[in-house]
Amino acid sequence: MSRTVKLVLGAGVVVLVAVLGFLVASSGQEAVEQGFVVAADLDPEYLTLPGEQQGLPTEGPVPAETWRGIGQAAPLSEGRALWVPRWSYKTAADVRTIVSKAASANFNILLFQVRGNGDAYYSSVYEPWSDRLTGSLGRYPGWDPLALAIQEAHAAGLQLHAYVNVYPSWLGVTPPSSSTPQHMFQRFNAQYGNQWVQWDRNHSPMGLNEQYLAANPAHPAVTEHVVAVCRDIVMNYDVDGLHLDYVRYSGPYFSYDPVSDRLFQAQGGGDRGDWQRAQVSELVGRIYDEVLPLRPGMALSAAVWPIYKDKWGWVTYGTTTYAGYGGYFQDCRGWLKSGTMDFIAPMLYGTAVMNSRDRFNTLVADFMVESYGRQVYAGIHADYASFSEIEARINMARRAGCQGQAIFAYSVVDGKGYWDEFRAGPYAQPAKVPAMPWK
């Protein structure tokens, strides 16, 4: 459905925001259907969604592989992004250390997380300061993480992209405390009841649980709120880009809520999967069309599911996890084709990919075939016992023609002590961030 049609259908519905995980599924089968891998996968502090699998499935042990001739000279133009999740820092000194170490290893982009679950790591008029910084939701920590990160990154010659969790909205069984501004959980519940969150196929709404709660991509107020949050960041901070994560539904059997049912029927029915993909793409398109022009030249990117469509039988439907297009209604290649995304970072890790160079290479090549003149940064997890595994994947991505890599994550690289290996190996020569000639 076009963005114009969506706006017409959504007219009169109050604008709202969301980024909630979801209620633990009512049955083991439904829990399994919610399998997820995200940019934050495998970090010890990361909390998965209910029923979420740690990675993608394998059908048995993956044989050892030998690769020859994968060495590749470092290009002069290459994106070298580093995911910096919000748990990587609590103090100004932490941020300075992050920038210093990344710069020393010749990274050139920091994907710096500033929104986790309806909270903020910057001065926001829409959402309260995160309680991770002070212990109290809404309390000013005495410094501004995003402002400092931008200042330090730019001084060191790095780009700073504000990294935003899109649909997760709260975390834990205890509701957010009172704050100024009021958290979206309380505000939206007061305005819309439970119809702004995702519902399962039994028409049961998500509720507070020990993991993420997730907002309804089809609720116009959710879309409006997320667009407003992104606009607020871009208008007030000198960011070089916006980076989206969790920009998808929570699984193939969400969201069967009254708002979605009504809007879907209003358009005359049809294929519900196509309609759900259009809801997510609507948000992406609005951010690109309405927010990016406020800061000309900035980039929009997203961490996306590692398997777009399962052409190889690697996904066992109904038992573990799904492909991005059909299981999470994330049409990332459609965004590239429509010109509403500058680069994607497929998260090429998880159990089905992590230990297989062949599968990594297959997926990288598959994404490059349909990149439509936009850019692909291969997402590589740093949690390998040997740095040679990371270097091999960087070289495979280069050979496939990827414009860059995104390494997950600062805390993993730091824990492994791989900074010197990056600097002495694949990132020995500094590189410029690739130009975006369509800008």
Placement of each model-derived feature along the sequence:
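Catalytic domains of carbohydrate-active enzymes, especially glycoside hydrolases
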Residues: 94-120, 236-241, 334, 338-344, ...
